[in-house]
From Swiss-Prot:
Localization per Swiss-Prot or TrEMBL: Cytoplasm
Its biological purpose: Required for spatial organization of the terminus region of the chromosome (Ter macrodomain) during the cell cycle. Prevents early segregation of duplicated Ter macrodomains during cell division. Binds specifically to matS, which is a 13 bp signature motif repeated within the Ter macrodomain.
An annotated Gene Ontology molecular function: sequence-specific DNA binding
The species this protein was found in: Salmonella arizonae (strain ATCC BAA-731 / CDC346-86 / RSK2980)
Gene Ontology terms: cellular component: cytoplasm
Protein name in the entry: Macrodomain Ter protein
Amino acid sequence: MKYQQLENLESGWKWKYLVKKHREGELITRYVEASAAQEAVNLLLALENEPVRVNVWIDRHMNPALLNRMKQTIRARRKRHFNAEHQHTRKKSIDLEFMVWQRLAGLAQRRGKTLSETIVQLIEDAEHKEKYATTMSTLKQDLQALLGKK
């Protein structure tokens, strides 16, 4: 395992995940009967500040179909948490208009690269173009100076 598991922190994430799914209308309990499901949800809501008991609730009451998705979500959250500790691995976000994002995503897909790699490539292309234009301008001025002197 690449990232250390922190039980208290991850239990809090699990609690937030389950509460969010419940508020979105998903069935988070294994119970078909509405009253039993609501009772289990009420119990979960009362466990907000008791992370160790959240894991017990998950073992007893959680919908098994939700287990895999929750594990994936927690694994991704753990990765982001540990990557955020170092500047070079921390993810940054930028606001893009949808059309810009769509064009960038299309370009990245055509090039077979990630969005970040595509952006770096576009920046490098622009820098090379700028350097080429400067070099050509200098050569043109030098050539004019040589021809103008004679």
